[in-house]
Amino acid sequence: RIDQAGRPHHLLYHLARAGWTDIMLIDRSELTSGSTWHAAGGFHTLNGDPNVAKLQEYTINLYKEIEEVSGQATGIHLPGGVMLVSNGDRLDWLKMAHARNRYLGVATEMISVAEAKKVFPVLDEKQFVGAMWHPLEGHLDPSGTTHAYAKAARMNGAEIVRKNRVTGMRQRPDGTWDVETEQGAVHAEHVVNAGGLWAREVGRIVGLELPILAMAHQYLITEEIPEVVAFNKETGREMVGVLDFKG
């Protein structure tokens, strides 16, 4: 496995748990030193692909297991989340997404804007026409979660090699691979390109041109909002996350 970011550690853990103990993850630097260290850490299950939505729900439910297995905190918080829409077309889309989620066993619920305001009291009801609620939404510590996966994978027999850049790969006639690294060659039956942001460059080592492009996302960090602080203090719980779909 040639690694970058948190997802490869997720896969490494599952392979090790399934009995693949002779596996190695090769990281060119330190764990979480790529895009993970500055990730916002938010998560939700709403996705245009229903299979991805179901996979996201599975992963969210897995975080507590990873904490228990590894003893490493993930910093997970599950206040729940509300998806809001501001027009009829988007409301139709949200209803479709809800129906698809329920078919797959994802426990979303259509709620009124008034009900949404009860869990997100700073909401301006006049701006929206509908909402969907899901309890498995929130945020976590990306770095802590990655290290929890890594520790759990090691406990199941996996090996992680850090500060070891891959410099080349060559396939043998029998289909196995020689992976050249800065610390020497590794002979592998299978190679997983988990390079994330650099997966295209890793693919080019063996002549593959992967259609991967980095997308610039953004998040906003604010000062404390008095209304949010007051809500959290008065209710003893965290105000939910909100997504606004304007089309």
Explain the meaning of each model-derived region:
Residues 12, 16-17, 152:
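Gly/Ala-rich phosphate-binding loop of Rossmann-like dinucleotide-binding domains
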Residues 16-37:
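Glycine-rich FAD pyrophosphate-binding loop
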Residues 9-10, 200:
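Residues forming the Rossmann-fold NAD(P)(H) cofactor-binding site
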Residues 1-8, 24:
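Beta1/beta-strand and adjacent pyrophosphate-binding region of the FAD-binding site
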Residues 169-247:
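Flavin-dependent oxidoreductases
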